[in-house]
């Protein structure tokens, strides 16, 4: 099993969700996040004064899937989230040793 974490632009969330559903994923966890990378922050005007906004709004998507779906899920996220502009985001993949469904006690792939 693998855990895929994707940091994307908030307005791309619906497209990414639909792309993952087409791959066959049944559930995702979404968290609002703020951060910056190479794009750094940007300047905004507020009441006539310019402020530097260091952290930009992002969305973090987390999914845990079987190894057989990893490449398809990564490709779906990448295609749906890509705008071609700086700040499109990142995808991280890590190993998951175990998953347990609290309600039933199922474990492994049966739990996801």
Curated annotation (Swiss-Prot):
Q: Name the Gene3D superfamilies for this protein.
A: 3.30.70.120
Q: Which InterPro entries match?
A: N-reg_PII, N-reg_PII-like_a/b, N-reg_PII/ATP_PRibTrfase_C, N-reg_PII_CS, N-reg_PII_urydylation_site
Sorted alphabetically, which keywords does the UniProt record give? Nitrogen fixation, Nucleotide-binding, Phosphoprotein, Transcription, Transcription regulation
Cystine connections: none
At the top level, the lineage of the source is Bacteria
Q: Known PROSITE patterns for this protein?
A: PII_GLNB_CTER, PII_GLNB_DOM, PII_GLNB_UMP
Entry similarity comment: Belongs to the P(II) protein family.
Subunit-structure text: Homotrimer.
Quote the function comment for this protein.
Answer: In nitrogen-limiting conditions, when the ratio of Gln to 2-ketoglutarate decreases, P-II is uridylylated to P-II-UMP. P-II-UMP allows the deadenylation of glutamine synthetase (GS), thus activating the enzyme. Conversely, in nitrogen excess P-II is deuridylated and promotes the adenylation of GS. P-II indirectly controls the transcription of the GS gene (glnA). P-II prevents NR-II-catalyzed conversion of NR-I to NR-I-phosphate, the transcriptional activator of glnA. When P-II is uridylylated to P-II-UMP, these events are reversed.
GO MF terms, alphabetically ordered: ATP binding; enzyme regulator activity
The protein in question is named Nitrogen regulatory protein P-II
List every position bearing O-UMP-tyrosine.
51
Gene Ontology cellular-component terms listed: cytosol
Provide a GO biological process annotation: regulation of nitrogen utilization
């Amino acid at each position: 099993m693998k855990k895929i974490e994707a940091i994307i632009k908030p307005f791309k969330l619906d497209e990414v969700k639909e792309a993952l559903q087409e791959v066959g994923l049944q559930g995702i966890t979404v968290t609002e996040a703020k951060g910056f990378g190479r794009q750094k922050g940007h300047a905004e005007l507020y009441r006539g004064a310019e402020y530097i906004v260091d952290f930009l709004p992002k969305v973090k998507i987390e999914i845990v899937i079987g190894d057989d779906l990893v490449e398809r899920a990564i490709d779906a996220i990448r295609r749906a989230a890509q705008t071609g502009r700086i700040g499109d985001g990142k995808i991280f993949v890590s190993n998951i040793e175990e998953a347990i469904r609290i309600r039933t006690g199922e474990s492994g792939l049966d739990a996801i």
